[in-house]
C-alpha cells in the first residue's frame, strides 16, 4: 500500500474533523445495537468529489470505542492519503458504491439477520421485500407495495473481482438501496451520512422482519 500526503486547507481539515466526529458517533450507535460487533463493519463518507476523497473507518478498529485516529482518508484508488490506520480490503466495495450511485456515505454492518438471510437466499441471488410500511423510509420509495430487491453476492477474498461485480450490478440497477454478501452482512448507503443511517436502520429492520416471518412460518408448518 502506497501513501502520500494530501494537500490540507483549513476548510478540508475542518470538514474531516466534522465527518470523523459524525462517523465515530454513528459507530457507537450501531455498535450498541449489535450491528458492528467485534471490530466488524465499516463506515465511510465523501469529503471531496474532485478529486474523490473518502473518510472511512480503519481496518480492525472497535466501532464502539473509536477516536479520531481510527478514521483515515483514502483516494479513488483506495490509497491512504491521511492517517496511520490501514484500510480494510472492503474499502473497494465502498468505492464501487460511491462511483456507481449518487451515494455520499456507505455503511457496512454485520448483523445476525442479514448474515442468516444471505446464506438462505444465496442460491436465488436475491431476496425481495414487499408490503412493509418501512420500505417508504428508503429514498425514492413512495409506497409499501414497492418490491425492494436486495441482491445477494457470494462472499470472496477477491475484493477487486467482487467490486467489479457490484459495480456492474449497480450500473444496471440504479434503484438499488443495498446488497448483502453471503455469510458476511449488509451494505447500504445514502446521499449523506444521515440518509445512510436511515437506510441501514430501515433495511436491518426489514431483514429481521423477513427472517422472523420465515422462522414462524416454519414453526406453523411443523405444528
Task: For every predicted segment, state its role.
Residues 2-223:
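Glycine-rich flexible loops
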Amino acid at each position: 500500500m502506497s501513501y502520500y500526503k494530501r494537500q490540507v486547507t483549513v476548510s478540508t481539515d475542518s470538514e474531516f474533523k466534522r465527518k470523523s466526529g459524525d462517523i465515530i458517533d454513528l459507530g457507537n450507535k450501531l455498535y450498541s445495537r449489535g450491528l458492528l460487533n467485534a471490530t466488524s463493519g465499516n463506515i465511510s463518507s465523501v469529503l471531496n468529489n474532485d478529486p474523490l476523497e473518502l473518510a472511512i473507518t480503519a481496518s480492525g478498529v472497535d466501532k464502539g470505542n473509536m477516536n479520531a485516529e481510527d478514521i483515515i482518508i483514502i483516494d479513488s484508488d483506495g490509497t491512504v492519503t491521511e492517517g496511520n490506520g490501514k484500510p480494510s480490503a472492503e474499502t473497494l466495495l465502498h468505492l464501487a458504491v460511491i462511483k456507481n450511485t449518487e451515494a455520499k456515505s456507505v455503511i457496512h454492518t454485520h448483523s445476525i439477520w442479514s448474515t442468516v438471510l444471505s446464506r438462505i437466499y444465496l442460491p436465488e441471488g436475491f431476496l425481495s421485500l414487499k408490503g412493509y410500511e418501512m420500505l417508504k423510509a428508503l429514498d425514492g420509495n413512495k409506497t409499501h407495495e414497492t418490491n425492494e430487491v436486495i441482491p445477494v453476492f457470494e462472499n470472496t477474498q477477491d475484493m477487486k473481482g467482487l467490486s467489479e461485480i457490484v459495480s456492474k450490478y449497480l450500473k444496471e440497477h440504479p434503484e438499488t438501496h443495498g446488497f448483502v454478501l453471503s455469510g458476511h452482512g449488509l451494505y447500504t448507503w445514502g446521499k449523506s451520512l444521515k440518509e445512510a443511517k436511515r437506510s441501514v436502520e430501515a433495511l436491518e429492520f426489514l431483514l429481521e422482519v423477513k427472517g422472523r416471518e420465515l422462522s414462524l412460518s416454519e414453526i406453523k408448518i411443523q405444528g
